[in-house]
A protein has these predicted regions:
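Solvent-exposed N-terminal domain segments of exported/luminal and surface proteins
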Residues: 28-258, 264
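N-terminal charge/polar-biased segments
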Residues: 14, 24-25
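Extended beta-strand-rich segments in extracellular/periplasmic secretory proteins, especially
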Residues: 188-236, 292-371, 381, 387
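Hydrophobic helical h-region of N-terminal Sec-dependent signal peptides
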Residues: 9-17
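N-terminal signal peptide c-region/cleavage motif recognized by signal peptidases
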Residues: 19-22
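Bacterial N-terminal signal peptides that target proteins for export
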Residues: 1-9
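Long, C-terminal catalytic modules of enzymes
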Residues: 432-460
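Gly/Pro-enriched, hydrophobic low-complexity segments
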Residues: 25-59, 103, 231-299, 336-442
Length: 460
């Protein structure tokens, strides 16, 4: 197998340049290539040289397109690729053969954990989004700019701001602002901090969000520096049940920090929660992830220097419908040291590589982070995180599916592995839940994401 070369997109001319001086709006000619030689979000339409990565042909655009026309939100999504078998399996014994298409994190997991393996399946570029998001992206691409600090995006709403990123900040903002829904979404999920021996206590969460940036009535003038308002309600275990978290996530957090409030059922009061950001430990996570690791990365980019390294072909979790299946129990999935590889699906895809290096005058438990972003969706698929001695510490994966009733590509499970302790945390589990996710929760309104509503919820 040939050593993988950095793949350079003709629209991203300064791949290694991280300075803000390299940012520029897309030209009319560049925008005209969206949907022609490039996907509507800026990925390469063509497949790769040997055909292992197919051309993008629109992805799965509906439940009918997936082969399940009667499917509705709130259920477990049937697998469009059921019956496929792995092309091959990567193990510690044969990993050298595939080294050019493995991340540092996956190499480490294969070396450290003798039972970890990667079943590699045929690649399907299933990512798809509503046409209105594609149209909004064409508009945003002509006007969007990073602000003076790079900590926010100006002159863009509803669409992806930078389909042809010129630097690392633009790429990471694409992830932060990529489409998840334009209606209120609610889901029931589980979070499992796993001990080294495989024991865990499941934390059940009701998670809801209103995507301000993507709503149909949002304009540049009324977006009010907001990306999303979201609320977590802990349902179990009993010692945590009733804990509520409300977050108003801002576009430019250096100008206006993220606003967060928490309701503690023991104290029966709402208080501000300024620590719900950056490297503070996430709620009920046993310290295994930081707040800015949810959705693989969230919040302000201000503590890092960002560098766009280029594009690579690597094996990433993709089309993880088996992991999402209601035929599995949580104990089928969660094993000592890592998720059961039997239920994981990896495919070869092109990704953007972004390096984040901690600024000298700031602090974070991760000195360096390497992000791998799917070219078809801008979802972060994998992250390698290094400690302050520059040693690989934690490895994160987003196991994604196309929620084809929308459609939207998003994680069904995030797995964050601590290689130094042998522990990990899985977030997003819903196999044993009767209700999974509803992308148009009409029984909720934006007023349900206010401090007053948080107080009311706490008293119920």
């Amino acid at each position: 197998m040939k050593i993988n070369q950095i793949l350079v997109s003709g629209m991203a001319l300064a791949l290694s340049v991280a300075s803000l001086s390299s940012t520029a709006k897309m030209t009319t000619d560049e925008i005209a290539q969206l949907g022609v030689t490039l996907t509507p979000l800026g990925g390469e339409m063509a497949g790769n040289a040997d055909g292992a990565i197919p051309a993008w042909e629109g992805g799965i655009e509906s439940a009918a397109d997936a082969g399940y026309p009667d499917f509705k939100s709130s259920g477990h999504h049937p697998d469009p690729y059921e019956g496929e078998t792995p092309l091959f399996t990567i193990t510690t014994q044969n990993m050298a053969q595939y080294a050019d298409k493995l991340t540092v994190g996956h190499k480490a997991m294969l070396e450290i954990y003798p039972d970890f393996r990667m079943n590699v399946y045929p690649s399907h570029r299933s990512a798809a989004f509503p046409q209105r998001f594609y149209e909004a992206t064409r508009i945003a691409a002509a006007t969007a700019t990073l602000n003076a600090t790079g900590n926010g995006v100006d002159n863009a709403v509803k669409g992806l701001p930078f389909p042809a990123p010129k630097n690392g900040l633009e790429a990471i903002w694409n992830h932060r602002l990529h489409y998840r829904s334009d209606g209120i979404t609610i889901r029931n999920i589980g979070q499992a901090p796993v001990l080294r021996n495989g024991d865990f206590t499941l934390v059940k969460i009701e998670d809801a969000g209103v995507p301000i940036y993507h709503q149909p009535n949002t304009t540049v003038d009324n977006v009010d520096n907001l990306v999303i308002k979201f609320k977590h309600k802990v349902l179990a275990p009993p010692r945590l049940a009733g804990t509520l978290l409300l977050v108003h996530d801002t576009l430019d957090q250096s100008r206006e920090p993220r606003k967060a409030w928490i309701y503690n059922p023991g104290q029966r009061r709402v208080r501000r929660a300024p620590n719900v950001a950056f490297d503070n430990p996430a709620i009920a996570s046993d310290g295994l992830i930081t707040h800015d690791q949810y959705d693989m990365y969230n919040g302000s980019p201000e503590r890092y220097h960002w560098k766009l390294v280029g594009k690579r072909e690597i094996y990433v979790p993709y089309n993880a419908y088996r992991l999402h299946s209601d035929k599995l129990k949580y104990t089928d999935i969660i094993r000592p040291l890592h998720l059961d590889p039997e239920h994981l699906r990896y495919e070869l895809h092109r990704v953007w590589v972004v390096e984040a290096t901690l600024k000298e005058d700031t602090r974070h438990i991760y000195k360096r982070r390497t992000f791998y972003l799917d070219e078809d969706s801008w979802q972060i698929m994998h992250v390698d995180q290094y400690d302050n001695r520059n040693r690989l510490w934690r490895v994160s994966e987003a196991h994604v599916i196309n929620y084809y009733e929308v459609p939207v590509l998003w994680s069904t499970v995030e797995a964050h592995y601590d290689l130094q302790s042998g522990r990990y945390i899985a977030f997003g589990l819903n196999n044993e839940e009767d209700f999974t996710v509803d992308f148009s929760a009409t029984h909720l309104s934006e007023s349900d994401f206010s401090v007053a509503a948080l107080r009311r919820d706490g008293k119920r």
